[in-house]
Amino acid sequence: MPKIQKQISALYTSAVLGNFSLTGAWVAILTARGFRLVEIGIAETVFHITSLLFELPSGIMADVFGRKRMLIVSALMQLMGNLVMMFSRGLVSVCISMSFTALSYNFSSGTGDALAYDSLKSAGLEGRYEKFQSNLMTIYRLCGGLSTLCAGFALALGYKIAYGTGLVSQAMQICVLLTLREVMPDRPRQTEPILSKFSACIRESLSFLHTARKALCIMFCNSLVGALDTVLLFFLQAKLPARGIPQQELGAALLLMELGGVVGARLILHLSRWDYPSVFLTAAALVAAGFLAEHAVAYPVMVLGGFLSALGDDALQVRTNALLQGMFPSQQRATLTSVESFTFSVIMVVLSPLAGILFTYW
């Protein structure tokens, strides 16, 4: 039990170091640097195209080479992204930075979840995974909210110093990740060549997806809601100042919207009797309300809409992750979790440029 607690605590600490930064309101920072919303939409599209290309390979690498190693690679990619952004001058260098950041997400998405679930499963505690996911989503939202709260501070410091602090965070994160214990399912093919392991992982994952159509449907529903919430919150960073919110209140408003996700992640733990369709429909309705609130004359209504959207998104995310992890076989857990992230990226590649145009002219 103490070893499991140490393992889970290290994953929580890594999540804090990987998600808290002075540059959380990166859309606002780019806007302040003179980038247009359409350009920001292009940068976001590059991010998701990179995710699209490397999401599945990164998941397979985690299942073949080890989850701990890929989490360390993830931190290194984030470090490179911050370094490039520090010296960026135009859209091209910003896009390169976004690509490194996308790779960071690729190597961590699914990998940490797989390591956590198999760690809990090895101790017979897999029933606690939904609580782990709730805590993790709370960390993500709180770190994201606190990061955006630092928006004014980051703008005052300058983007170079702001991104420079991320280099320190990633170095600390790597030190924490080195303390993790690798937990991999027993494999009968440990002596097989690497290419054989890759092909076997792909073949078995495809076989699972072919027979588990329900899992694919769940992935799509969750990714669609998550993508809509993501683009809404991203562009509200730029729309709120245009609607008249005082600069000193922007960080607090962005934090409040992120706290909606915290409420959703905690609330879903008390709704165990709700079936998945009920959770999905409620989450979709809350995100739709957020989009409608974006047109409100008063910016507090826009903030409330963002809060409700985040609430629905994270409640659905926690329930989805717990449901899917219980369905996935351990040997392909990271790969199959990456399929969900891949689905999200496909939707975001389409939505990001459309949202940039939509929020500019609508």
What is each stretch, according to the model?
Residues 2-53, 212-255:
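Helix-loop boundary and gating motifs at the non-cytosolic
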Residues 159, 163-193:
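Helix-loop junctions on the cytosolic side of multi-pass membrane transporters
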Residues 32, 85-87, 144-165, 169, ...:
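Transmembrane alpha-helix termini and helix-breaking/packing motifs in multi-pass membrane transporters
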Residues 1-5, 181-218:
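Juxtamembrane intracellular "pre-TM" segments in multi-pass secondary transporters
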Residues 43, 68, 234-362:
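C-terminal transmembrane bundle of multi-pass solute transporters/carriers
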Residues 52-89:
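Conserved MFS/SLC helix-loop-helix module at the cytosolic interface between two early adjacent transmembrane helices
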Residues 76-90, 285-298:
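C-terminal ends and interior cores of transmembrane alpha-helices
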Residues 98-141:
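Cytoplasmic helix-loop-helix junction between adjacent transmembrane helices
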